[in-house]
């Protein structure tokens, strides 16, 4: 999950959570498919390197049944740069550091940009509807936040981009400076999470602090919003809100903060993204709702936003489409 806490003066104001985290970039959220464009494009080169360096034990782990699932393979690939056997062999980190490899890959970078943009966009919508002050600092914790560095390791650049998202959503200038914490060299996001647990006294989160934003009508889930209450109009309006987001991300934001100039996104991948973001949104939404209903009762209150269900599907399809375009060159 991605868990977001809105805090002011060391006090938690609001909390929201949704199942849209780094694993969403490396798996098909709606099937058991073992295909993922990002992983399939890169894993062969890394396997060849393991063979070349005669790292048989790591080669066996690579080929294990556990790593057939692409999100598991992604976790394994990310771990290699810190592996003691890799370090002992003196392998150049540039060739084995999966995070670094993805940073240098301009073809798939649009996927990571959309991932980040969608989360900040959602946060900005909550800030707007709750009348909160836009954040002075945004801090990332947890291993999944390392994915942010794939977009850029320059926190100032990312802060400028993030401020523009807020300004466009809020329709007004940003009231302060914005610092992105957690991108500096040597920062361990998982360690930050642990330290926070030790330093901060535990207090029970009140129900009225937990919010679930409904992007289709710019309101928040109430006790009346149950899974059984979701009708076709609700779904259609949600799809429209997703279409609005993709137009915002791929057109509005790219026009004011050129993705190629700032992040190194290729024009071809941007073109593919604009095509894929229009496909099967309702199907992805319905599959996401159905999966969530398997974990809930029909009369249960909706526990997470539907906003990210179609985005998950699009990002997976986009990874496949970019992979196909590269293999067909």
List PLM regions with ranges.
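Proline-rich intrinsically disordered, low-complexity coils
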Residues: 29, 70, 135, 173-175, ...
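Conserved helicase motor "Helicase C" RecA-like lobe of SF1/SF2 P-loop NTPases
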Residues: 147-176
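Secondary-structure transition/capping motifs at alpha-helix termini
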Residues: 11, 129-131, 161-164, 204
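Phosphate-binding glycine-rich/basic clefts of nucleotide- and phosphate-handling proteins
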Residues: 3-153, 215, 219-244, 261-282
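Acidic, glycine/GT-rich loop-and beta-edge segments that sit at the periphery of enzyme/chaperone cores
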Residues: 175-329
